[in-house]
Amino acid sequence: MLYSSLPVCFLVLGAALCAPERMQNEAEPHDLQPHEAEPHSDHVAPLAKRSPHYDFGLGKRAYSYVSEYKRLPVYNFGLGKRSRPYSFGLGKRSVDEDQSNDEQQLTTSDLDQAALAELFDQYDDAEKRARPYSFGLGKRFADDETSEEKRARAYDFGLGKRLPMYNFGLGKRARSYNFGLGKRYSKFNFGLGKRERDMHRFSFGLGKRSGDDVSADDSDNYFDV
């Protein structure tokens, strides 16, 4: 009987030792007012929220967004969305350096269509696309205004379009290379049946003499009697 009561005594002693200690001036929980029931509630509530430094994860960003479907300007790029230094491609060209900042672009966008029309009227059709990257199929950089050299630009060459120094090919030669079959300079224009007019020293052969040479030979062969 004595041995069976020993475990019960140990349990009672352990419960007494493990009971929370209370100060004498501390009130009982059931005696507290409703507003004093949880004095540490203000300190426990922030534990459920993360710091903005660690407020990221699946569907959570390190920055605060107005909406979860809106990106910051730093990440505002993708299909059809490019930042201004990279806003070029098919049909999109980079702007000049003087118009790269946002203030100048806002000023340009505020101009009405009438002012833009007056600005473009000052230039001809060839100069409307006079930009460093404004060239392509049928679009080239423009310098002069003459009709013949309207497309004779630094990049204005291709199929049937050449600069004057490269404007040669089948049936097209520059003046320095404009010779070939049936095409010679005057100093090289000699051959079978072709002699230079002023080079009479080579204009002889079977039945071919100049009139001056024939008269001189006749005078030498015949003497007056």
Swiss-Prot record:
Highest rank taxon of the organism: Eukaryota
UniProt modified residues of type Leucine amide: L58, L79, L90, L137, L159, L170, L181, L192, L206
One term of GO molecular function: neuropeptide hormone activity
GO cellular component: extracellular region
Coarse class of the protein's main subcellular location: secreted
Annotated InterPro entries: Allatostatin
Compartment(s): Secreted
GO biological processes: neuropeptide signaling pathway
Protein name per the record: Helicostatins
